[in-house]
Amino acid sequence: MKSQHENEEMLTGGNVSNVYRSGDTVRRDLKEDSPKIHKLLKHLENKGFNYSPKFLGIDEKGREILSFIEGEAGNYPLKRYMLSNDVLKEIAKMLRLYHEAVSDFPLLDEFKPIDNTPQKVEVLCHNDFAIYNIIFNYEKPVGIIDFDVAGPGPKIWDIAYTLYTCLPLSSFYPAETEQEVHHVNYDPSLHASLIKKRLTLFFEAYGEEMPLDFLEIVLLRLEGMCKTIKRKANEGDSAFQKMIDEGHLEHYQNEIKFIREHGKEWI
């Protein structure tokens, strides 16, 4: 859809802020945390990590200018190819490359851990390396966007949320149609072995073994998300209150119960 600014197009997918495309660039209003994110994007560019947007400056309206990554985001309903085994392996490799690129990024005090982050700090986690922030082109993952909640933590913290959204580790398992994906209720006899296989594929492609406490980390991550949504809403943040009103909080609470009940079937 066209915005109030001529020749700009509002991009879909954001829960918290509006994002506009202008030619080969993306424009977003500056936030208090924007300068530190610009440092991160500059670091990634200097390290040759080609999957993130490049920070190009500030426009005449006081908005940040980022390079536009051509393709489509993993917005719901997902395309069938977005949940293929080959794509999952490529996402694992992309996350590994991100972690390698930030391995020497200075963990400045201005970057804070998100709720429930384990204390073992290894890298600056993206913290939202999720299917809806991955850009696909020619049916392959080609980019990762939205670094707004980046913060220090262990690499497995990123891996846990990536797998939750990209595998997915969910009470509704993807069922393929000709083009898009619809979801059916999880059936252990049908889906447990598929999830187990995809977990193995991801960790093999990432290059590390799955830790024994992996599912506890996934649960910790989802519980932290619930904590964040409730706290932000209580502080008067309308975007997070909208998430509650639209059922996001209840959804994640139900997912936590589901993983506690069925997660042992995947390990």
Task: Explain the meaning of each model-derived region.
Residues 2-43, 57, 65-67, 74-81:
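ATP-binding glycine-rich loop module of kinase domains
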Residues 225-267:
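ATP/Mg2+ or Mg2+-diphosphate-binding catalytic cores
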Residues 77-111, 115, 122-127, 132-137, ...:
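Conserved kinase catalytic-core helix
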Residues 45-58:
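Conserved HxN/HPN-centered segment at the entrance to the catalytic loop
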Residues 110-116, 179-184:
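Short linear capping/connector segments at secondary-structure termini
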Residues 17-21, 113-161, 171-174:
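Active-site acidic catalytic loop and adjacent metal/ATP-binding pocket
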Residues 159-207, 222-236:
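Active-site activation/catalytic loop segments of kinase-like enzymes and analogous catalytic loops
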